[in-house]
Amino acid sequence: MGGLWEFPGGKREKEESLEECLEREIKEEMGVTINILKKIMTIKHTYTQFRVTLHAFTCELQSKKISPTECQQWKWVSLSNLKKYPFPAANVKIVKYITQNKLLI
């Protein structure tokens, strides 16, 4: 969404599990592999023109060298600064959850 920050992710392919989708999308967008730790929430949100369902997971990186390919800009942001970034409405719910629960990103 133009001018807003988003978490890495994307659309699930047919016959793909949520975890397989997450691993594929992170590899495609960031060039890294991950260990999925836990699913933390599902968000269903309706915008004016469309609806989205977001599934948020906690993960850890298997490799530290990030090579983003599908984003204009990326940053590591501390929990204390995360709320300063503009996110789409559905993502704001995830930001609130991870900052309240002090989950590391």
Residue ranges of model-derived segments:
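A conserved beta-turn-beta hairpin within the catalytic core of GNAT-like acetyltransferases
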Residues: 1-3
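Active-site-adjacent beta-strand/loop module that shapes the phosphate/pyrophosphate-binding cleft
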Residues: 33-35, 41-66, 75, 98
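The catalytic Nudix box helix
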Residues: 7-41, 78
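Short capping/connector residues at structural and topological boundaries
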Residues: 6-12, 17, 52, 57, ...
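NUDIX/MutT-family hydrolases
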Residues: 58, 65-99
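Generic C-terminal helix-cap and adjacent flexible tail
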Residues: 99-105
